[in-house]
Amino acid sequence: MRIGFINACLAELTFEEQLRWSQEKGFKDIELHTAPRTLKIDLQKVATNRGEADRIKDLLAKYDIKLSSLLLGGQHLHPDPQKRQASQAHFKNMVAAAAALDVAAVTTFIGRDHTLPVKANFALVKKYWPEMMRYAEEHGRKVAIENCPMLDEWPSGYNIAFAPEVWEEVFSILPSPLLGLNFDPSHLLWLGIDYIAALKKFGSKVFLAQAKDSEILKDRLDQAGFLGEGWWRYRLPGLGQVDWGKFINTLYEVGYDGPVSIEHEDPIWEGSLDKVQRGLLFSQQYLNRFIV
């Protein structure tokens, strides 16, 4: 197992600067975020131009860094056709670029029509996702689903794949061996779901793992209740309430021995490049205590 990170938090640096810093600090893996504000490579150019793909691969080799996945959540089931089609097109660009770069997986969301209940979205999964998975299978890429509810569309969110019962249904609809999870315990913690039990049950479907913590603010919860806002926040691993020793041991138990990517969304350790980098290094040192 190796500790890496998602590069979105270092968006102000160039791609080579990110790689150089990562090498200097002992990171071996990066999850490459592909949102417009964070994207460091031209996905379509990489996918269609062998010279550009080779240039990126040479840069990675120079700094001895491996890309664990190309990442963007996406709104693949959005009720607005333009947003939905653009999201699905970006997914395909990630898949094609991942194939050109020999990156094993892409990370994304299932998506959600936030105007509908979760169960009503299963019909949309059946409508849109088989073709998306065929594209991934044609390119030999794994698809790792993030389990974040994405509450930007409060209170329903725009990703239905946030709970074990939904994963069960999605994997039933889409029985591809190339569809799995990018497992992040932080979301399950604040949702009140036993993340260790979920990890054990779906261990064979864990393609990647993300390291983000959550902190429950009990004083605020007592005032706002579960349907209120501001009673939890994301933290760096080691600063919230996830039991990381138990989580990483369970990853080993279920047979996972790949990268664990720190996702830096900690409001306490933001505000400057120096704070972000020190936050990453804190969690790297903390998590490495559990890696053997």
Write out the residue ranges for each language-model feature:
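Short alpha-helix boundary/capping motifs
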Residues: 12, 50, 77, 88, ...
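Conserved beta-strand positions in the central sheet of alpha/beta enzyme cores
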Residues: 31, 69-71, 107, 144, ...
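Active-site-proximal loop/turn and secondary-structure-junction residues that shape catalytic pockets
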Residues: 9-11, 34-36, 73-76, 110-114, ...
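Glycine-rich, proline-tolerant flexible connector loops at the mouths of alpha/beta enzymes
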Residues: 33-57
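Surface-exposed, active-site-proximal loop segments in enzymatic domains
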Residues: 38-47, 72-90, 110-123, 224-231, ...
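Histidine-acidic metal/acid-base catalytic patches
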Residues: 1-29, 61, 102, 155, ...
